UniProtKB/Swiss-Prot annotation:
Pfam families per UniProt: 2-ph_phosp (PF04029)
Molecular functions (GO terms): 2-phosphosulfolactate phosphatase activity; magnesium ion binding; sulfopyruvate decarboxylase activity
Record carries keyword S-adenosyl-L-methionine: no
Protein name: Probable 2-phosphosulfolactate phosphatase
InterPro entries given in the database record: ComB-like, ComB-like_sf
Keywords: Hydrolase, Magnesium
Lineage of source species: Bacteria, Bacillati, Cyanobacteriota, Cyanophyceae, Acaryochloridales
Domain of life where this protein originates: Bacteria
Cofactor(s) in the UniProt record: Mg(2+)
EC number: 3.1.3.71
Entry's family note: Belongs to the ComB family.
Top-level EC class: hydrolase
Coiled coil recorded as keyword: no
Amino acid sequence: MKIYTYHTPERVPADWQPDCAIAVDVLRATTTIATALAAGAEAVQVFSDLTELEQVSQQWPAAKRIRVGERGGKKVAGFDMGNSPAECLPERVRGCRLFMSTTNGTRSLERIQASPLVLAAALVNRAAVAEFVQKHQPETVWIVGSGWEGSYSLEDTVCAGALIHYLWGQQDAPLETLAGNDETIAATALYRYYQDDLLTLFHHSSHGQRLLNLGNEADLKYCAQVDILAIVPWQVSPKLLTKA
């Protein structure tokens, strides 16, 4: 197995696809996706374009659809939910399909949609995703962070490092043999440094600061938890995720 880490979807190679691609947007899209599916949502369908989301969701029964829209950390006017995992209560999402568009995370999922195996990971479901990857043993794995509008993010990199660290622990080999690029080694180092204080890292990050300024400290605390959900969101058709 070779693991390649890319900090943003813009950094992903255009001329080849891995056997497995994992999208990461810890604050907050992939955390919300995992939480919604764990709470009983039927599926999450992602869109980069809000207009397309509205058109497609109109074809779904109103009682069974939830429109999730976020731009700049804020809920989009007229949508049912913003991009907060705290809104994904079982009584609200059970049996429903979430139609979701966010500033960053949904772009990552769209960028890797052609890969044979597409997963969504966050810290909350880190072990579940890593065990799923370990079981399937893909030869090449991409971990694709979402960043913020094309720029690097600490929180996605530390989550990539958490995944790599877990997978590395299942291998009888040095990290260099698992790493496909230097970013994989750097992400692992970041996680090893902050693994016992992830919330502090989130407070240092630019997007963490952005969410704090919007009054979303509870989301940061939730998203900083590790291995609390035994859920693996995987793509069953382009841009449509259910639990594996």
